[in-house]
Amino acid sequence: MSKVCVLTGKRPKYGNTVSHANNHRRTRFEPNLHTKRIWIDEEKRWAKVKLSAKAMKIIAKTGTAELAKLLK
């Protein structure tokens, strides 16, 4: 299962978790992804996509036109 946002391209990042004692251990930071059904007006159909929280805000502001271009 891919952990990549369709609209923004966000993907997991790698870094360190640092404790109070300054011990470092490697960790994977996952993007805040959700599987959503979005209605595409131009094509009159539902599209099931993985979106980050930021992508959902972008769609709320601009509409689904950008997303429709990416899904073609």
Swiss-Prot record:
Q: Give this protein's Gene Ontology molecular function annotations.
A: structural constituent of ribosome
Q: Which Gene3D superfamilies match?
A: Ribosomal protein L28/L24
Q: Which Pfam families match?
A: Ribosomal_L28
Identify the domain of life.
Bacteria
Q: Which InterPro entries did the record assign?
A: Bacterial_rp_bL28, Ribosomal_bL28, Ribosomal_bL28/bL31-like_sf, Ribosomal_bL28_bact-type, Ribosomal_bL28_sf
- Is Nucleotide-binding a UniProt keyword of this protein? no
- Coiled-coil ranges from the UniProt annotation: none
Q: Name one GO biological process term.
A: translation
Keywords (A to Z) from UniProt: Ribonucleoprotein, Ribosomal protein
Gene Ontology CC terms, in alphabetical order: ribonucleoprotein complex; ribosome
The UniProt entry's sequence similarity note says: Belongs to the bacterial ribosomal protein bL28 family.
HAMAP family assigned: Ribosomal_bL28 (MF_00373)
Q: What is this protein called?
A: Large ribosomal subunit protein bL28
